[in-house]
Amino acid sequence: MCKNDATTNEKKPNQLTHRVMVGNVPLGGDAPVVVQSMLNAPANDVDANLAQIRELAAAGCEVVRMAIPRRDCLDAFQRVCEQSPLPVVADVHFDAQIAVEAARRGAAKLRINPGNIGGLAKTDAVLDAAGEVGIPIRIGVNAGSLDQDLAARRDLTLPQKLAASAAGYVEYCEGRGFHDLVVSAKAHDVMTTVRTYRQLSRDLPHIPLHIGITEAGTQFQGVVKSASGLGILLEEGIGDTMRISLTDDPVVEMRACWALLSALDLRRRGPEIISCPTCGRCQVNLIELAKQVESNLMSTTKPIKVAVMGCVVNGPGEARDADIGVACGAGVGVVFKHGEVQRKVEEHAIVDVLMEEIGKL
């Protein structure tokens, strides 16, 4: 993605990041922001992981990450890679040999933290293994694994320390001839994360960045925190791939990712529901009506705008840019397309008629 001047809200593309391939998915350069998630099924359960991958793929996931906590999980990882419809990233901590084996067993990318993988000699083995099979590596750093000398420096802020740590590892890898790198430096605090990625974008303008707010929390708080931080970064042109990390079903992460990208007009997938917050003029159960429409459209991938309005004040006038919508009155709804009234229906039939008309688009 284009890196922009982080000091202004104006879009000012400076330089494209280096493109890497994660399986058949391009990441970086002029490629669109890649949406990804992480499996949370037991690492040894092949069927459960594959079922989750299929659900994620149907929800718009493009790359999926799988933790390999022990060497006895490698066989399961290989079987998942062989059958997965999505590229699978191996997430490895503490044991470099697992990363080496994962590269040989079908990983589309490796995710390591050089600070806990066992030192530079073991990092070398991982670089060699990835280089042999031609897959990229994501270097993920965090405050807990900073070099002690770097962590102790009082002249640097935490974002500067995280960026310096990542830059040091990038320099080392590139010095050994390995260039297919992606970098992340996530924190659970929104503005620490934003400042860190701004620093990374300045220090490593050629490196694709994986952005996210780590340990963001449960659905409501996690989506708010992630949208706040990632929205800032994406608007500034920072970020080549993203994950919204939630303590929830990973499929919920996909809905949040695509909603954010759509809100920023970066990518679109599936419908956008436009609905008013209701007021004393509303004479139908609009809250339930909007929820029904949203639920019925959950599996729709068509990028359309659907308006569900509580009265004639808000629709079709204020929702004129919607592809289709309904403006409700006393027990009735007026269905409109692009601001033009199509038909009037009873309240009990609004959802069915709206779905019927959407099917014609």
Model-based region annotation:
Residues 2-38, 131, 295:
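N-terminal amphipathic alpha-helix/helix-capping segment at the start of soluble metabolic enzymes
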Residues 30-48, 67-69, 86-94, 115, ...:
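Active-site mouth loops of central-metabolism enzymes
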Residues 33-39, 62-66, 88-92, 110-112, ...:
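Hydrophobic faces of well-ordered beta-strands that scaffold small-molecule active sites
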Residues 38-49, 57-84, 111-119, 181-190:
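Glycine-rich, proline-tolerant flexible connector loops at the mouths of alpha/beta enzymes
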Residues 70-92, 125-137, 198-207, 293-297:
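Alpha-helix-loop-beta-strand connector modules within alpha/beta enzyme cores
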Residues 83-86, 103-110, 131-134, 201-207, ...:
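Glycine-enriched alpha-helix->loop->beta-strand junction motifs that scaffold or abut catalytic
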Residues 141-142, 150-299:
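Catalytic alpha/beta core domains of metabolic enzymes, predominantly
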